[in-house]
């Protein structure tokens, strides 16, 4: 005779979680593979107490974002759209022109698209720092090096 009254689901509270800082070197790595590794860390899916509706993930620092690779012909053919919110205000950029203007933007756009939409996704995106080269101001944090494929 089993009674199921004593079984309780335990939820981890974000205030008890110590956030770590991970650094990913993006030089000569594929953009999508870097983005998926970063999102996994940001969401906290690498932890045993992952909860989809809470910010239990860690902070991610990506360096050398300007040296990221693309597969196929995406360097010339991938198009990024943005809108000014005025009639006829649709603008488009190829990967080449966008990365020349702002080298961190393609990686940030890829990661933002993989995060949940809404307040939680915006909160998780604030835990991401992307730098175009190896120089960054976060060396005072205890950074753990993460190897991505």
Swiss-Prot record:
GO CC annotation, single: cytosolic large ribosomal subunit
Protein name: Large ribosomal subunit protein uL13
Subunit structure as annotated in this protein's UniProt entry: Part of the 50S ribosomal subunit.
Superkingdom to which the source organism belongs: Bacteria
Keywords: Ribonucleoprotein, Ribosomal protein
Pfam families: Ribosomal_L13
Family: Belongs to the universal ribosomal protein uL13 family.
Gene label: rplM
BP terms from Gene Ontology: negative regulation of translation; translation
Gene3D superfamilies xrefs: Ribosomal protein L13
